[in-house]
């Protein structure tokens, strides 16, 4: 059970920054703590913490670049009873200490582990990550499997899909001739990130997201984060990220993905790669949302809160995944699974062609959703759906969940 801080290495320090007046943020969530890093050097962190008694567990929120813990304010506000929500600012980011040193992804994962240990977070834990925070959160998850209850991801990536050279916007910012100017000397990268949303975010929200990054000194880690993205072999973090990307395939815990499909950074190829690595994931698309999906679709917080509720309400023997119930080797959906990557048509309805690939993905999503909603093997399910591709998908999903269609 996640506990209140008891570790002697944790020290409360100074006053938290004055965050009063920031839209949607309760200033009482803000706190500063000092924790030794793996070299034993004391490091001062800023974090948001709703302070709830973790009856069910803790949600560990990990932001990306160039955001900060403010990104997660909606989830702190929407958290169901019994869930503690902790959202730290990475070292060098937000209102955490500027260490003066570039920190690689493996160091940031280790930093996060030392922080959670000092905060007394020992499970159950649900990780949630966005942007570069996605792979850091997954790195923490892989290092703390015994504490891990679930994984949530929003518009992120763990690998470059085959044939992909990386997001053009990030590759541009990554160039040695561009990065010092665009990411550090000027707020171009910081302000450009908030400009990806359309309609535009309210000015006060854009200003709040940029608040910790007002000077070049405070933006140094923004450039360091970009420099640490391994686009090719030989990069200092390439092997670490590749190992993490493969390790993710072994995470068999319940998983939720929430996605802004208008993202010019992490498009559909990155989502497809994640779903291939985490096939049990339930997906929520928020149409019209871009890269900052938490801002463009604030209702994501309600979706995550509902999913957290499912984690604690579903019977232990019914996983929140798309894994079939106990069946023989050959099932009613075996043929569909065998052709899950086949783009050829499986059916045509009213001029609309449905591929084997899309049908298999839809059945997987629906089956996981049915299990999460409480459908048990042997349950009788009535369907009020007109003959269509949707009906076919729902029937197969019901069978896969172990239900009987009547």
Predicted segment positions?
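Alpha/beta-hydrolase fold catalytic core
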Residues: 1-59, 80-83, 121, 227, ...
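Conserved AMP-binding/adenylate-forming core of the ANL superfamily
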Residues: 38, 44-48, 344-396
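Active-site loop/oxyanion-hole signature of alpha/beta-hydrolase fold enzymes
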Residues: 41, 48, 87-129
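Conserved HGGG/HGGXW glycine-rich cap/lid loop of the alpha/beta-hydrolase fold
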Residues: 50-95
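Conserved serine/cysteine hydrolase catalytic core
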Residues: 218-276, 285
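Catalytic histidine-centered segment of alpha/beta-hydrolase-like enzymes
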Residues: 289-301
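A short N-terminal helical cap/helix-turn-helix that marks the beginning
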Residues: 325-346
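Short hydrophobic alpha-helices that are characteristic scaffold elements of the AMP-binding
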Residues: 396-404
